[in-house]
Amino acid sequence: MFEGVLPALITPFTKDDTIDRTGLIKNIEFAENGKVTGVVVCGTTGESATLSTAEHMEVIDIAVECANVPVVAGTGSNNTAEAVELTKHAEEAGASGALVISPYYNKPNKAGLISHFRTIAEAVEIPIVLYNVPSRTGQDISLEVITELAKIDNIVGIKEASGNLDKASQIIENTMDEDFKVTSGDDGLTLPIMSIGGCGVISVVANIVPDRMSRLVNAFNEGDTATAQQLHYEIAPLIRALFTETNPVPIKRAMNLVGLNAGHLRPPLAPISAENNKLLANCLKELGCLQ
């Protein structure tokens, strides 16, 4: 379920600033046509920080209802009780698993982190994937904590987005005795992480080129490293352009440019700069996504 390519879907909004149900369904269909293995909703790319609890649940419900691939629901919070509530809802809605970010801002110690994730895992039966993205949370989940959490039956993997390939390697090394998967949280590190035993990527760029990212991962898994490398370098400029500003600012703009369903950003996020918009458009043209 957590192997292969899972796009971290954006959350499209209507002009009235409500969830664009039709747009979300179309985006899921577009991803599925690109042969992704699953989809992730309500993550960083999905602007979960500015979704109300009701909206969060609504997005999960829509995705589970319409998707033909496994749905992984972002259910993290810096409030343990809220994370439990969201994860329980994901399970009841029929999500295949939950992606749980480390508590942001609070910065709990080792005992607090372990207790937080254990409490969430014990409240449900669906698989849990940890989400480590210190650039957004302000705290890097330590190798010691990850190794301990990997022993919990339904904590089955981690989205590793620290950008530290050596740390990803150590996580894989330390959890070899557990059925624990490491997936890349950085599009540009997908191929390097897979080369050391990672299982795929939870991807931003797959919102717009799901087929290319799926082909990259499949080529590597089939032993065709030359094709995987070719695809890596083919989409690398777009990946860099998607992170010239805070995610999901560039990816939403890119999707709107090529006619996909993204809608606006919720404040305090603001539209992309003219300079970065030009760079993004040029990258899309180079890939044939934009005329």
Swiss-Prot record:
Q: Please name the pathway.
A: Amino-acid biosynthesis; L-lysine biosynthesis via DAP pathway; (S)-tetrahydrodipicolinate from L-aspartate: step 3/4
Where is the site described as Part of a proton relay during catalysis found in this chain?
44, 105
The lineage's top-level taxon is Archaea
Which Enzyme Commission number(s) are listed?
4.3.3.7
Q: Which GO terms describe its biological process?
A: diaminopimelate biosynthetic process; lysine biosynthetic process via diaminopimelate
Per the entry, what this protein does is: Catalyzes the condensation of (S)-aspartate-beta-semialdehyde [(S)-ASA] and pyruvate to 4-hydroxy-tetrahydrodipicolinate (HTPA).
Q: How does it assemble?
A: Homotetramer; dimer of dimers.
Kindly give the PROSITE patterns that the UniProt entry links to this protein. DHDPS_1, DHDPS_2
Q: Which organism is it from?
A: Methanococcoides burtonii (strain DSM 6242 / NBRC 107633 / OCM 468 / ACE-M)
Query: What Gene Ontology cellular component terms go with this record?
Result: cytoplasm
Q: Which family does it belong to?
A: Belongs to the DapA family.
The alphabetized UniProt keywords are:
Amino-acid biosynthesis, Cytoplasm, Diaminopimelate biosynthesis, Lyase, Lysine biosynthesis, Schiff base
Keyword Cell membrane assigned to the entry: answer is no
State the encoding gene. dapA
Question: One Pfam family of this protein, by short name?
Answer: DHDPS
Q: Where in the cell is it found?
A: Cytoplasm
By its UniProt entry, which SUPFAM superfamilies does this protein fall under?
A: Aldolase (SSF51569)
Tell me the protein's name.
4-hydroxy-tetrahydrodipicolinate synthase
Classification from the root reads:
Archaea, Methanobacteriati, Methanobacteriota, Stenosarchaea group, Methanomicrobia
> What is this enzyme's catalytic activity, as reactions?
L-aspartate 4-semialdehyde + pyruvate = (2S,4S)-4-hydroxy-2,3,4,5-tetrahydrodipicolinate + H2O + H(+)
Q: Which GO terms describe its molecular function?
A: 2-dehydro-3-deoxy-phosphogluconate aldolase activity; 4-hydroxy-tetrahydrodipicolinate synthase activity
